[in-house]
Amino acid sequence: MSIENAFRLPSPLPQWPPGTGFGGGTIDLGGLLVSQVSTFTKIWAAQEGGPDGMGATFFEPSAVPDGFHVLGHYGQPNNAPLFGWVLVAKDVTNGGRAALQTPVDYTLVWSSENAKIKQDGAVYIWAPVPSDGYKPVGHVVTASPQKPPLDKIRCVRVDFTDVSETEDWIWGTNGLNVYSSRPKNRGTKDSGVSTGTFLAGDSVPSCLKNLNTPNPSSMPNLPQIKSLLQTYSPWIYFHPDEEFLPSSVPWFFKNGALLYTKGQESSPAPIEQTGANLPQGGNSDGAYWLDLPTNDADKDRVKKGNLQDCTCYVHVKPMLGATFTDIALWMFYPFNGPARAKVEFLTIKLGKIGEHVGDWEHVTLRISNFNGELKRVYFSEHSRGMWVSASQVEFQNGNKPVVYSSLHGHAAYPAPGLVLQGSKVIGIRNDTEKGNTVMDTGASFSIVSAEYLGSVVTEPPWLNYAREWGPKINYDIAKELKKVERFMPGKLKAELEKVVRSLPNEVLGEEGPTGPKWKDSWSGDERS
């Protein structure tokens, strides 16, 4: 689908349970009331350049609510359906210096008059010139060389602004690149707010700032969180050849997982089902670690996990100045299987490389606090991952995203197929396929943390275990590679070793991972 088609979620949104501000259509940033507008009037389009060479289209927000003002226009690549939004704002300061002000002038950022591109006539991109004490948070796009009217847009009082940065590339041609924007600081306690507008050329408009954080009345309460999970909980498909499935944490503990203490390796301790006897807090200092049962039969059984006794663990957090809710859904796998490499036309098993005990993977749903609409899904892929617009996600049973878990490594992907870490000739395989083994995360989830709700959600003891969920394994990479390199042409041996050694230790299997709470995404944005 192209931008000519507007994207809508497959099913209408439900009526959310009552609360203080979530889903109410507007959010008060502390004297600046903002609303999310997703209806647009097309201004101009290019038919080439940008992602996939398909061009980009620029829009003016329309159907702006009474009393609200435009802060900037919207741009999007043409290689996806129209699924955008911008914030519009209303001054509710009740006296004092106004939160919004018209610009005093415009400067021309770029014109396509002399650009030799396929385009709908000429376009002019303008930067507002603010009066003292105000900043622009967006650009204006026109099809006329005349400057826009001064009341076309509003600049924002400086204390309602924060530092922004570029995010995704929208479009570019000689002398100009256009990007979407986001706040530079994006932790759970940061107050920067995305405006939905774009950045063009060298000018970097600010983003907004929520002066009401850290009191996020716009965030969902517990009944609303449960309703969001009923609406958007993903389906996870496992590869038909997957041997190592997820389980619940209590199942792992009660089936023989052991707690080891440095210096007392000969006497590991069984673990209580809630993890009550695990050391709490601290850091990853090698003093403690978990491992599989010592009995070989039990070890092999626990490695395989138990999908019938599996729970998805949910962490809910405010993002982008509490204008969005991130719902991270964490899956625990007792064991991560061995890696495989693609070498030209061959698939080669890499021995013990990639094996490790205790594998935590997650998917994150980014939901608008204005209306409860799912906007993006984050697919974690080992130490990094990628955000995917809801318009590019596969859905099943209404508005539930489909996730594909890679064979042995359990990385999450939005579509089936092969993704290589490395080059097209040689790399580590991440294979996904829609097998018959599938998990409905909405059928078995546990909300383990929502810090902004205070004592409403009680965190289980295992969540505050800061050490590794598997032992550190020191195996000889060169020795493991030597076992497989005899099948390879000589020129590719060094290249394979380079790819393998570039993998992070958690992926290599040299050390067990820490739990969800000790990832930097727990209190920050996802890595992408």
Could you say what each language-model-derived stretch is?
Residues 11-58, 88-123, 152-177:
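Short, flexible domain-boundary/linker segments around small modular repeats
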Residues 12, 16-19, 26, 203-359, ...:
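A domain-level signal for the mature, folded cores of soluble proteins
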Residues 38-44, 48-53, 67, 308-310, ...:
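Eukaryotic beta-rich interaction modules
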Residues 56-57, 123-124, 325-327, 361-363, ...:
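Residue-level detector of short, conserved catalytic/binding motifs and their immediate flanks
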Residues 63, 68-71, 118-149:
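Amphipathic alpha-helical packing elements
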Residues 68-76, 85, 101-105, 137-140:
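Short, surface-exposed polybasic-aromatic patches that bind anionic ligands, especially phosphate groups
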Residues 161-217:
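Long terminal segments
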Residues 366-370:
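Short beta-strand micro-motifs enriched in acidic
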